[in-house]
């Protein structure tokens, strides 16, 4: 298959994906626009119902010219000898209609046949089209199935390409949707150049300032439109109905997390292989834990954390360190780094004649931020010795990312400058999913989560959010429910406050060196005590305030 099809076409090809051509386009933009400060003229072509309008006789002629004969060719012709279609209306089918055009829908062979049908488009482009050179290879176009990108160094060259493409489509009975096709002029100033236009036949192609190519929004400046933000917004939109389902059917947290990674995570991490790169400033100040500091603030994790906080029942302001620690979830931004490294490793081992491999070599010669990020990640994760073995490299990448993230998490949690999570530091020994999250009663789960993660209404936290003119220092946020003149923190609430003395007698709650394990080892008593204690606290608010 690869021998018959040009490397410019990667649609439905084994070991190839949309990220390959996104990477190729980004590389060309990086070289022409950002490094050489020149304009790049591009048209994104949309074929109208390309699969449905393939001329079968012309397809068979092309297959024979490619050397496909004998039994294989006879079988293909037999498949299309008599093709009938009908429409199902409820339980009734319309009379069958014969069809002499198009490829069969749902047939696994159709993708390959279409690739072979359109592959000879490569022969129409020549040097007068003024192609872009990447690693000594001239590129005037590339395809992902029927998504065609045509590009040139000049407006004259691009128009010449379009004239040839228009003629090609006529001969091959393909229809170009001019309304859906768009032109863009990439330039270093980022200006929307609308006075230079292109046409297909007599129809003008609409110039645009940005275009969504294979799911990624490119701007005429050459940048990707808020890459991580856009993907996160798409994920957030898909999360809302999932959260409704979780709440309606009371889906357990573990199952909810699995659903998130099945349906939402792929949306957020789509094509992040090309987005995972540090800025110039980040690279300059990069240090060993730099990727983890960036991860803690990454916007790509916003939707993920939103789901975790939702199933835990905590507020948006609940510390992310506690959310990660109690769910045991690894941030999606780290997954994007893993995907980036795996993508780089896959392309590194490709044949040199593939366009994406040439794009990688171009990145290396240009010393782009993307390549520098790859180098930084490999050095930080200490996985350079695993590069020669694909399976070991993938495993080592994931293992090292998770291990170093957990180490960074513990160090961040133990930071003495972190005023919040004092109680959490004492009760949380290891990074991982906590059993209390399996509580089926959401209100009980919520109360335990809030107490553990410093997201409660005790004075130690409540006082933090008061206006500056009445806010008290941490050591002055006293409990108003007893006369011990003590700070109302988690330990005081659990063990010391006299308001709950009678309640404690109903449970095996005591203070000794093992108290930090209480919330974990005595879960059945913990949830009941916390629930009743907070209820008692609410009942006594008026009298406490008056006293």
What are the roles of these predicted feature ranges?
Residues 1-116, 120:
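Conserved pre-catalytic core of RNA-dependent polymerases
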Residues 6, 13, 145-146, 177-182, ...:
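Non-catalytic, peripheral interaction segments enriched in hydrophobic/basic residues
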Residues 10-20, 32-37, 47-53, 65-68, ...:
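Conserved, non-catalytic sequence blocks in retroelement Pol enzymes and Pol-derived host proteins
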Residues 49-66, 141-170, 187-189, 220-224:
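Catalytic palm subdomain of template-directed nucleic-acid polymerases
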Residues 91, 175-209:
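Short, conserved micro-motifs composed of acidic
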Residues 261, 287-288, 296-304, 315-462:
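Extended C-terminal regions of large enzymes
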Residues 414-417, 421-547:
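Family-specific functional microsites
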